[in-house]
Amino acid sequence: MKELQGYLEIYRSRQQDFLYPLLFQEYIYVLAHDHGLNRLILYESMENLGYDNKSSSLVVKRLIARMYQQNHLIISANNSNQNKFVGHNKDFYSQMILEGFAVIVEIPFSLRFVSSLEGKEILESHNLRSIHSIFPFLEDTLSHLNYVSDILIPHPIHLEILVQSLRCWVQDAPSLHLLRFFLHEYHNWNNFISPKKSIFIFSKKNKRFFLFLYNSYVYECESIFVFLCKQSSHLRSTSSGALLERTHFYVKIEDLVIVFRNDFQTILWLFKDPLMHYVRYQGKSILASKGTPLLMNKWKYYLVNFWQCNFYLWSQSGRIHIKQLSNHSLDFLGYLSSVRLNPSVVKSQMLENSFIIDSAINKFDTIVPIISLIGSLAKAKFCNVSGHPISKPVRADSSDSDIIDRFGQICRNLSHYHSGSSKKTSLYRIKYILRLSCARTLARKHKSTVRAFLKRLGLELLEEFLTEEEHVLSLIFPRASFILRRLYRGRIWYLDIIRINDLANHQ
């Protein structure tokens, strides 16, 4: 990165950031290879091509020239996999260059992110990228709010608009032309972003490149929206420029162009709200407010018009669902989140008179959707649709310890992810299903009964299904099981989780 930064500093005096020449630098492809996306295709294919230098600029020049040949862009349905270049599939060379191009177009954003961290005391930024970091924020804010809008970010976007949105970041024309070529090529291959319900599915090839495009598109969608939220709030929030979110782009904007003030004064008057909060996750976003239903509907129709006018997307109002937190639950990252009243009675004594005061406090609840989770376990053949554990087919050469480790790891992962649940009963039931399914699998393998295996293994099988924290506490308090129950009755948000659990992703 220091070498790239030094290269770009030369052109900063001319107020230009030329990225296209970097495409012919060999270390770019080394960086692309080190990032772990399609690791073997670049080196192995170059060896097959017969070149000593794995990523020479001569090879890249030839590949780019070959890509721009008009007759090669014609894709026939009957001959889609037969076009070869030096004995390889037609998409190999564009695949190779696209890997390097994905690294190059990220450079302006990476440099801006590095400069934003200067002078800020952050030791390990990856600790701030946990999915669970969202929940403490919601726990502190949602209990004071009334309404929430569950928003599905519209897709797909027109390819040319993606190029236009990157012009303010990538300023040299050759890079933009090459980007336009890649987008239209993948558009013909039907390998671009495709919707599957509410989740964006990216092409398995060049996932890094498409994730970059999607993040830049969402960044563009949020730029004006975040500005409006800041200007419409009486309590100005501090920009979280140093906090990394897994699904967010590199850094939230510190300040937007001052020109926006004059253009949106009327809009700001319509959306004046002291408490407005915004969270994005998995192609969705949440807009929560303490306002009235009228205000939430204003935001709803403003967002629909904003998407249609700025991105030429026909977005229906059904993509935005307004819910009252006191009456509806929010399906959020594998949890059912809601705000409920927690009643309490306080007795007050004043001299000879006593008073009983009834009070209610809003409490943020996170519950594991047990029905959906059992459905996921049933789909994975751990139980039937009713939640009754069944034996899972395994390979004949699998050892007992491997089977137990596999079941135990799944159980620990689920317990770790859903540790923030308000009620642990659902987790206990999931542990029971996995433990008994493991016992039935072992009994089926050895043609024995479940009772015999449980009697023979006993506590050893139980220990495999304990989390690391439970195991440590059981060693410290071997005779105080009630302490364990008390400690694990509350919510625990582990901040080392960077992606949603596969079984928790019911959508």
UniProtKB/Swiss-Prot annotation:
One of its GO terms (cellular component) is chloroplast. One of its GO terms (molecular function) is RNA binding. It is found in: Plastid, Chloroplast. GO terms for biological process: mRNA processing; RNA splicing; tRNA processing. The lineage of its organism: Eukaryota, Viridiplantae, Streptophyta, Embryophyta, Tracheophyta. Usually encoded in the trnK tRNA gene intron. Probably assists in splicing its own and other chloroplast group II introns. The keyword tRNA processing applies. Belongs to the intron maturase 2 family. MatK subfamily. It comes from the Eukaryota. Keywords: Chloroplast, mRNA processing, Plastid, RNA-binding, tRNA processing. Its main location: plastid. It comes from Buxus microphylla. This is Maturase K.
